[in-house]
């Protein structure tokens, strides 16, 4: 069966190459493969066809952008829902801001709640809701990176508050607040070192500039 062979192929590639990733588009059901570039993925597609005898249909490659905040935004968000039975209530206050440049992590959650304004058992649910929201940004649906969130205050209801209520609250709050941080799209860049004969320096430089490459430095050594 073609699907079984495709699954085996993808599992083998994942084991062989940590930069090769596989996911499924929830809306279309398509299998999405990601890697270091178009050539990298072309090699794996050819292996699927040649080694595993699976005639796959491949769409046009897409650049894997990221979404990131550029300024601090404060939030004071209340989730309140009342139905026939018990309702839902959660209230969180805090801020969302860009990650400091010297920090390499993509997400930091700081709990600054004092006095039990948000019970300790609900705080992990707030963090979980924020983390879930990082998977798909509101600008173009790309993952979000470089976010520091702070939870400083809030409130709860003795009956209607729950882990789920605080998680839902955090998800909705994150999406709304992130849009206030003037978010931007980031595109992937790669650092490369190019060695060419001195006679070709001009054409190669022109080609890099045409592709929006940023040349940091040039050196000439032994006519190279």
Predicted regions: what they are:
Residues 1-224:
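Accessory interaction regions appended to the cores of large information-processing enzymes
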């Amino acid at each position: 069966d073609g699907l079984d062979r495709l699954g085996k192929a993808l599992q083998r590639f994942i084991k062989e190459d940590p930069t090769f990733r596989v996911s499924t588009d929830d809306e279309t059901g398509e299998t999405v493969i990601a890697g270091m570039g178009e050539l990298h993925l072309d090699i794996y597609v050819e292996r699927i066809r040649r080694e595993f005898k699976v005639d796959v249909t491949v769409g046009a490659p897409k650049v894997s952008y990221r979404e990131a905040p550029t300024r601090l935004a404060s939030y004071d968000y209340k989730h309140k829902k009342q139905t026939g039975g018990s309702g839902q209530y959660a209230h969180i206050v805090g801020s969302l801001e860009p990650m400091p440049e010297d920090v390499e992590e993509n997400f930091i959650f700081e709990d600054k709640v004092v006095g039990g304004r948000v019970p300790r058992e609900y705080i992990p649910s707030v963090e979980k809701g924020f983390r879930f929201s990082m998977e798909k940004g509101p600008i173009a649906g790309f993952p979000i990176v470089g976010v520091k969130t702070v939870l400083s205050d809030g409130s709860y209801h003795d009956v209607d508050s729950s882990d789920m209520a605080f998680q839902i609250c955090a998800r909705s709050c994150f999406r709304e607040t992130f849009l206030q941080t003037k978010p931007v799209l980031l595109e992937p860049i790669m650092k490369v070192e190019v060695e060419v004969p001195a006679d070709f320096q001009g054409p190669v430089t022109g080609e890099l500039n045409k592709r929006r490459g940023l040349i940091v430095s040039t050196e000439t050594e032994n006519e190279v």
